From Swiss-Prot:
InterPro entries: Hyethyz_kinase, Ribokinase-like. Its EC number is 2.7.1.50. HAMAP family: Thz_kinase (MF_00228). Substrate binds at M49, G198. This is Hydroxyethylthiazole kinase. Keywords: ATP-binding, Kinase, Magnesium, Metal-binding, Nucleotide-binding, Thiamine biosynthesis, Transferase. Belongs to the Thz kinase family. Its cofactor is Mg(2+). It catalyses: 5-(2-hydroxyethyl)-4-methylthiazole + ATP = 4-methyl-5-(2-phosphooxyethyl)-thiazole + ADP + H(+).
């Protein structure tokens, strides 16, 4: 698949989201619930957040994709994630994992490894420190922010992708997406994404929306990041600072067209790391 074909797949995925409005079930953190619900809605999908063990699996059975985000952990939420993830696996529903702060505490790291070991995860999206921690390549995370990444991000992502048969995404100045064989780099985005809380979690939400309609999860993840980054570029043109940028970002995601994605996505293929 060449770059032109990739851009067309990205655009077609956005069009299918708008046409079919897939339900995306989020078991996510308190900090970003409103933002991830809105970004899911604005891209054209339908968000739902059902965290209790009494209904997490049942709700997942209705969804087109499941997000597991460990930003505000508790034992009860981990149990709900496992129940929801098992139902998703049984039903062929893609699971997208956001390992927020993996490496910052033992509990976060152990929870991520437990989820990866017990579930089939379609996509894992994190920053360089989080993915470096989980792959064994190193990396330093303070709170939920990466303060020291890995020397070779594509290689670290590839190790994790091979180990768990998943698509691994490292978001940063350039986004790396790999299934352990194919490697894509997405170059859309804007530095102001680092000034708003939850920008990574919103990226994960969009990956899940794209995965609900695009069965090649490498293409789904790269397409979501290209669309998100393009919306950020457009939003930055009219924003005056972080607060107005956040509002403009949601507006631009809402108004983004498949044609804009086909024309504006900046993606390249790399050799296997």
């Amino acid at each position: 698949m060449n770059v032109s074909e990739l851009r067309l797949r990205f655009a077609n995925a956005l069009a299918r989201i708008r046409a079919t409005k897939p339900l995306v079930h989020h078991i996510t953190n308190y900090v970003v619930m409103n933002d991830t619900a809105n970004v899911t809605l604005h891209v054209g999908a339908l968000p739902v957040m059902a965290h209790t063990t009494e209904e997490a699996a049942e709700m997942t059975g209705l969804a087109g994709a499941l997000v597991l985000n460990i930003g505000t952990l508790s034992p009860a939420w981990v149990d709900a994630m496992l129940l929801a993830g098992r139902r998703a696996n049984e039903s062929g529903i893609p699971v997208v994992l956001d390992p927020v702060g993996a490496g910052a505490t033992a509990y976060r790291t152990e929870t991520c490894l437990r989820l990866l070991g017990g579930l089939r995860v379609a996509v894992i999206r994190g920053n360089s420190g989080e993915i470096g921690t989980l792959s064994g390549a190193g990396g330093v995370v303070r709170g939920v922010e990466s303060v020291e990444g890995v020397a070779n991000p594509a290689a670290a992502a590839g190790v994790l992708a091979h180990r768990y048969n998943t698509v691994t995404v490292i978001t940063g100045q350039r986004d790396i997406v790999t299934d352990g064989g194919r490697v894509l780099v997405v170059d859309n985005g804007h530095e102001w994404l680092t000034t708003i809380t939850g920008s990574g979690c919103m990226a994960t939400a969009l990956v899940a929306a794209f995965a609900a309609v695009e069965p090649d999860f490498l293409v789904a993840a790269a397409g979501a990041l290209a669309a998100y980054g393009l919306a950020a570029e457009l939003a930055a043109r009219e924003a005056r600072g972080p607060a107005s940028f956040r509002t403009a970002l949601l507006d631009r995601i809402y108004s983004l067209t498949p044609e804009q994605v086909a024309e504006g996505a900046r993606v390249e293929r790399l050799r296997q790391p």
